[in-house]
Every structure is written in structure tokens, then in C-alpha cells.
Amino acid sequence: MIYTSLAGELQSLVKGSIQINEPMRKHTTWKIGGKADLFLNPSDKEDIRQAVEFAREKAIPITVIGNGSNLLVKDGGIRGLVIKVGRGMAKITIEGTSIKAGAGALLPELAVFACKNSLGGFGFAAGIPGSLGGAIVMNAGAMNGCVSDVLQSIVVLNERNQFEVLTKDHLNFAYRTSNLQSRGLICVETCWQGYAKDQWLIEQETKEYLAKRKAAQPQGFPNAGSVFKNPEGDFAGRLIEGCGGKGLRVGDAEVSSKHANWILNLGRATAQDVLILIDHLKQMVQERFGVLLQLEVKVLGED
């Protein structure tokens, strides 16, 4: 499919920017990935609605991403249109103890905003680099807290290309999952419920949490955080370490010697390097412990 003319048509419908053959490594925290045929940075939710309608009319596949912090894009890239819900949709406002935010805002921004307004419940978000939309899709969490604890409702673009409000009860939240993706819904706005809490206390708890997180997690190399979900009652990192997985390397992809559930990009790692390493770790853990690890990161694109 020739995307140059399609890019021009789409640009006439939206205010955000369109790129052709956009390297996806620029849009993931792993700094890995091939090119997207078409790439849209929407300026608002109407841009997304227009782009989805256009793509469906032209039979162009649609992929929606957030900050790319939990994402591995394969080396062959992504066919069709990639929509990045990002900085054009990152406004955050407050109403009483409720916070409204665009799905492109980042979790740390939400945590800082809540702290400045003396609202508790958002400490878990301080050290997670994901966007709010992406975090809701996977029910992101840390520090004994997660998205579903404080989310109130969201606005989605539904299957009929209409905006719809859904309360969190409609999202079937579970450990690191929701039903947003399987239903083909695109989160564009979010609403969160906090509670009154002393700002100084929030700041101190957040500093302590971030210090512990920094001490326990690798620093200095691109990564996607935890690669595998923790099995019930156990930790993926402990199982991988128990198999001697720390320090294993394929190409420039290496299992961190500090946290075995993290795979680092030492410089020029490819998606194939990471996938080979993932398969090897899964096999090692299953043979040693009888546990089949499940991916927490999402894999997109073509080989």
C-alpha cells in the first residue's frame, strides 16, 4: 500500500502530526523496533476519532500505543496506522478530590499533581514511566497499589467510533490486565478518585518509595521494566535468578544482573535478540520449577 497520498489525506482531517515510515524505537523505552507505515501524534480526542474513521474506510490496520514503556516492537515494524496517545492529550485538572486527565499524561505526572493538591492514593504511580491510557489497559501498579485502586471512570472511543463513559466496573480489572484491549476500545480521558492527605507526608512516602525502587532496579540502559508477570504467590525474578538467568545475553539484549525480570538494551539490541532471550528464560524456568511464565510486556509488529 502506498502511504504517501494516504498521509496527505489523513493530515487534512487532523490537527496532529503525521509521519511516514516512523522508527518505532523512538517511541518505546526499550529503544527497539522497526518502522510504522503511518504514525499519528493526535492533538486531541477528535483527531483520534477522525483517524480511526479514515483508517476503517481505507481498510488500514490500526495500532494504538501510549508511552511505549511496556512494549516490544518487532524488527519488521508495524503495518498500517499507529496512533500514539501522547503529549497532545496530557492535560490534568482537579475537581474536589477527583482528578481528570488526558490519557496521554504520564503516571509520574499524575502522582506529582495529586501530591501538590494533597490527594493520597497515587504513590504507586510515581516511579512508573507509562501513560495513563496504557497503564489502564494493563492495570499497572507498584508499591502495593495499582490503577484499579484509584480509577473512577474513563472516556473511550468505542466500536461505533463514538465517545462513551465507562466506570471501572466495566473494565474487568485483574492482575496486570483489563478488558479494554480485547474490546477494541481506545482510552482518551481518565477520571481518578483520591482522598485528602497531608502533602508533606505524601512527599516523604514518595521519596522513600523512589529510593527503594532505584536501589532495587537497574539504571542506565533502555528497558521495559518487568518482562514477565509474577506467578501467583511467587516472583518471576526469583525464578529466573534461581535458574542462573542473571547476566544471560543474546546480542545486545541482557538479563540484568541486578533484577532478573528486567532485560536491558546494551546499545544495539534487536527485538529478535530480546525474543530469543525471553524464550530461553521461559524454557529454563519451566524445566526447573514447572512454572510457565507469562509476558507482562506487549509484543507488536512483524518479524
Curated annotation (Swiss-Prot):
Q: Which reaction does it catalyse?
A: UDP-N-acetyl-alpha-D-muramate + NADP(+) = UDP-N-acetyl-3-O-(1-carboxyvinyl)-alpha-D-glucosamine + NADPH + H(+)
What are the protein's GO molecular function terms?
FAD binding; UDP-N-acetylmuramate dehydrogenase activity
Entry-linked SUPFAM superfamilies: FAD-binding/transporter-associated domain-like, Uridine diphospho-N-Acetylenolpyruvylglucosamine reductase, MurB, C-terminal domain
Cofactor dependence is on: FAD
Instruction: Name the EC number(s).
Output: 1.3.1.98
A single BP term in Gene Ontology: cell division
User: What does UniProt list as catalytic?
Assistant: 176, 226, 296
Family annotation (Pfam families): FAD_binding_4 (PF01565), MurB_C (PF02873)
Q: Main localization of the protein?
A: cytoplasm
Q: Pathway of this protein?
A: Cell wall biogenesis; peptidoglycan biosynthesis
What are the disulphide bonds in this sequence?
A: none
Highest taxon, organism lineage: Bacteria
* Keyword field: Cell cycle, Cell division, Cell shape, Cell wall biogenesis/degradation, Cytoplasm, FAD, Flavoprotein, NADP, Oxidoreductase, Peptidoglycan synthesis
Q: Which family does it belong to?
A: Belongs to the MurB family.
What the protein does comes down to:
Cell wall formation.
Q: What is this protein called?
A: UDP-N-acetylenolpyruvoylglucosamine reductase
Name the source organism.
Desulforamulus reducens (strain ATCC BAA-1160 / DSM 100696 / MI-1)
Lineage, broadest ranks: Bacteria, Bacillati, Bacillota, Clostridia, Eubacteriales
